[in-house]
Amino acid sequence: MYLQLLKSLNRLHPRAWDFVQLSRMDRPIGIYLLLWPTLSAVWIAGNGSPTLANVLIFGLGVVLMRAAGCCINDFADRKVDGHVKRTADRPLASGRVRPREALTLFAILVGVSFLLVLCTNSRTVWLSFGAVALAFCYPFMKRYTYYPQVVLGAAYSWGIPMAFTAAGGELPAGAWLLYIANLLWTVGYDTYYAMVDRDDDLKIGVKSTAILFGDADRSIILTLQLLSLGCLLLAGSRFDLGGWFHLGLLGAAACFAWEYWSTRKLDRESCFKAFLHNHWAGMLVFIGVVLDYALR
């Protein structure tokens, strides 16, 4: 139903679907992976009772900035996506969207996101420039470093300190623990994603942690995920989160164990499924946060 609704936009403009695909609105997994930790931070920063305004600002901001990130990512990769089986049919790589159009859509999405941030406070507004810089830089990092996933992790985690400054203007140590936890988690699941394209990336010279980690990939991913859970546990103690939160962490740990087991053959399909599966881990942690505050 969701996809049919998006495809119906072609009735308004014959090229609407091309721009839906460019912004990946037809593939909401990236929204989920960014949304759950951001909302968890909004809830914790609001001590379990966030304002409706902050929930809407950060919820819509996630959707818009993820779409903007996809636009600039495809712009940066437009000359290499055609050489990768999974990405050859993307709008820019296939010529359905022009580079200038992708940059225009990126600017529009960032502009609307900035209007949302203006509804918060000055400190959050200043932090938002870091979010834009990281979103813009990430796709170009694949040419120069084997750690583009770390830059993505920094970008995907930037909403966490912004959620705290929007709620009260302060950045407690626990907020940075949440930030580090999410960064580690993002590096882990995006390495699974990079493992899908590893053979193609080696041929065309694109760098990633999947290439860097080599045969130790799954073990390093699991280590990153466990470190992420450790940081969440420490953050939870600082924010007095208890049983329900810990239950959410156990659920996430079970997800990580399944991902490690299911990718033992290192085939593309299982690695991609493991990447998608991280959505459930993030959701379980968020549910744990919400229930821990709601059932006190």
Swiss-Prot record:
Intracellular or extracellular location(s): Cell inner membrane
Database matches in Gene3D superfamilies: UbiA prenyltransferase (1.20.120.1780)
Cofactor(s) this protein requires: Mg(2+)
Principal subcellular localisation of the protein: membrane
UniProt KW keywords: Cell inner membrane, Cell membrane, Magnesium, Membrane, Transferase, Transmembrane, Transmembrane helix, Ubiquinone biosynthesis
Recorded topology in the membrane: Multi-pass membrane protein
A Gene Ontology cellular-component term: plasma membrane
GO MF terms, alphabetically ordered: 4-hydroxybenzoate polyprenyltransferase activity
Reactions it catalyzes: all-trans-octaprenyl diphosphate + 4-hydroxybenzoate = 4-hydroxy-3-(all-trans-octaprenyl)benzoate + diphosphate
Enzyme class: transferase
Pathway(s) per entry: Cofactor biosynthesis; ubiquinone biosynthesis
Family stated for the protein in its record: Belongs to the UbiA prenyltransferase family.
Name of this chain's protein: 4-hydroxybenzoate octaprenyltransferase
Native source organism of the sequence: Pseudomonas putida (strain ATCC 47054 / DSM 6125 / CFBP 8728 / NCIMB 11950 / KT2440)
Gene that this sequence comes from: ubiA
